[in-house]
């Protein structure tokens, strides 16, 4: 009986230890408004800068994935784009600033469609950091 209790305690301990060691995915989300009907400039900017940096980051193992979601703007939610960068674990997430600084320095100048600066055609209304992913509707 004592052996069974020890085994049960060890099993439960390993379950909790496994969850503590679980490196669940973490995302950042930027909610972006396109300004002054400059959709072409904004899309060009994100495809040739934001996306390029994320592709570089995937190739280096700095991020897990990225997505761009497009949605119609509304009075309550005046953003058109949601930019999502997902990290495979807390270690990747915690190193994000250092890693993206390295990639930005390597990439060099912004690739813009014309003389318009990013502040003229896009505005990040708000962002969410440290967005955790749920698995099978159970929060980890």
Please report, for each region that a protein language model flagged, where it lies by residue.
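Short, solvent-exposed loop/turn and secondary-structure capping segments
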Residues: 43, 78-80, 94-98
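Extracellular/periplasmic catalytic domains that process cell-envelope and extracellular macromolecules
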Residues: 21-23, 74-79, 125-127
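Short, glycine- and small/hydrophobic-rich beta-strand elements in well-ordered beta-sheets
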Residues: 54-82
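An amphipathic, aromatic/His-enriched active-site/gating alpha helix that lines ligand/cofactor pockets
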Residues: 52, 56-64, 86-132
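N-terminal targeting signals for Sec/Tat export/insertion, comprising classic cleavable signal peptides
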Residues: 26-59
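A beta-strand edge to alpha-helix "cap/lid" segment located at domain peripheries
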Residues: 76, 94-95, 133-140
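Sec-dependent signal peptide cleavage junction
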Residues: 19-35, 119, 136-140
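Bacterial Sec-dependent N-terminal signal peptides
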Residues: 1-23
């Amino acid at each position: 009986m004592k052996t069974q209790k020890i085994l049960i305690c060890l099993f439960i301990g390993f379950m909790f230890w496994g969850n503590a060691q679980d490196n669940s995915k973490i995302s950042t989300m930027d909610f972006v408004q396109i300004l002054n009907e400059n959709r072409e400039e904004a899309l060009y900017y994100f495809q040739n800068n934001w996306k390029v940096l994320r592709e570089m980051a995937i190739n280096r193992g700095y991020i897990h994935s990225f997505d761009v979601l497009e949605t119609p703007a509304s009075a309550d939610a005046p953003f058109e784009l949601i930019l999502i960068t997902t990290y495979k674990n807390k270690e990747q997430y915690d190193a994000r600033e250092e890693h993206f600084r390295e990639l930005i320095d390597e990439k060099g100048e912004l690739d813009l469609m014309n003389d318009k600066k990013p502040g003229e055609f896009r505005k990040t209304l708000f962002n969410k950091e440290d967005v955790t992913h749920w698995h099978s509707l159970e929060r980890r």
